[in-house]
Swiss-Prot record:
An individual GO BP term: proton motive force-driven plasma membrane ATP synthesis
Transmembrane regions listed in the UniProt entry: 24-44, 85-105, 129-149, 194-214, 228-248
Topological relation to the membrane, as annotated: Multi-pass membrane protein
Role played: Key component of the proton channel; it plays a direct role in the translocation of protons across the membrane.
Keywords: ATP synthesis, Cell inner membrane, Cell membrane, CF(0), Hydrogen ion transport, Ion transport, Membrane, Transmembrane, Transmembrane helix, Transport
Family (UniProt): Belongs to the ATPase A chain family.
Source organism phylogeny: Bacteria, Pseudomonadati, Pseudomonadota, Gammaproteobacteria, Pasteurellales
InterPro entries: ATP_syn_F0_a_bact/chloroplast, ATP_synth_F0_asu, ATP_synth_F0_asu_AS, F0_ATP_A_sf
Any Gene Ontology CC annotation: proton-transporting ATP synthase complex
Assembly behavior: F-type ATPases have 2 components, CF(1) - the catalytic core - and CF(0) - the membrane proton channel. CF(1) has five subunits: alpha(3), beta(3), gamma(1), delta(1), epsilon(1). CF(0) has three main subunits: a(1), b(2) and c(9-12). The alpha and beta chains form an alternating ring which encloses part of the gamma chain. CF(1) is attached to CF(0) by a central stalk formed by the gamma and epsilon chains, while a peripheral stalk is formed by the delta and b chains.
Organism: Haemophilus ducreyi (strain 35000HP / ATCC 700724)
Protein location: Cell inner membrane
Protein name per its UniProtKB record: ATP synthase subunit a
């Protein structure tokens, strides 16, 4: 059983990839992230197209609640023009939530379905792939730099990274190192927080599934309630992680846009 268990876990943690090493492209991550994005666009565009001023349907109510909630968060936390930030925050939350929610699909269902088409390795949760979360956080990093320059200009950006927190020319090297580390810590923490939580959640589902392979009937039976309890708890995890990624993005961009001089 030990060998079978190790092979089972290793199989479920293997990507469908093209290429080797650093340049390997995880095709399953790309596919499911695109599916999640398309699903978000289709649902929201359909609701917007069919929106009515009369009695709204359940889906329209849900979408309107999410939009108003996100818009309220942006209004409270981003002190600047929010015509771009609110749609960005909404997209981040919904996209990350949908990608996270794929983890609720039984661990063997999608790999076995893919195996019917000759695909032997498949990981369906994009946010459990560090390359995906790093890609999203790098985009946020680019927006941080963009809004910093837009708000303060290149001279303001240079002053911020050379004259803060110690406003003296002698501390320019120290200030630059401290501010650079602080800046780089933002996208890195964004990426690894989301990846770590989703990878751990995926691994726990796999370990619970391993219990069904046990020779002991009691251990097999124990897997059922454990699976149910973890799935219910994981709904909170996937929602919370999507919220945290969105909220930190809003806060980071608000700090970048802040015109107050240090």
């Amino acid at each position: 059983m030990a060998v079978n268990t190790a092979e089972y876990i290793g199989h479920h943690l293997s990507f469908l990839s093209s290429g080797d090493g650093f340049w390997a492209v995880h095709l399953d991550t790309l596919f499911f992230s695109l599916v999640a994005g398309v699903l978000f666009l289709v649902v929201f565009s359909r609701v917007a197209k069919n929106a009515t001023t009369g009695v709204p349907g359940k889906l329209q109510c849900l979408v309107e609640m999410v939009v108003e909630w996100v818009d309220g968060l942006v209004k409270d936390n981003f002190h600047g023009p929010r015509h771009m930030i609110a749609p960005l925050a909404l997209t981040i939350f919904c996209w990350v939530f949908i990608m996270n929610a794929i983890d609720l699909v039984p661990v063997d269902f999608l790999p076995q379905l893919a195996n019917m088409f000759g695909i032997h390795y498949l990981r369906a949760v994009p946010t459990a792939d560090i390359s995906a979360t790093l890609g999203m956080s790098i985009c946020v990093f680019g927006l941080i730099l963009f809004y910093t320059v837009k708000s303060k200009g290149f001279n303001g950006l240079a002053k911020e990274y050379t004259l803060h927190p110690f406003n003296h020319w002698a501390f320019i090297p120290v200030n630059f190192i401290l501010e650079t580390v602080t800046l780089l810590a933002k996208p890195i923490s964004l990426a690894f927080r989301l990846f770590g939580n989703m990878y751990a959640g995926e691994l726990i589902f796999i370990l619970i599934a391993v219990m069904y392979m046990a020779d002991n009937f009691a251990l097999q039976a124990l897997g059922i309630p454990l699976h149910l309890v973890w799935a219910i708890f994981h709904i909170l995890v996937i929602t919370l992680q999507a919220f945290i990624f969105m909220m930190l993005t809003i806060v980071y961009l608000s700090i970048a846009y802040n015109k107050a001089d240090h």
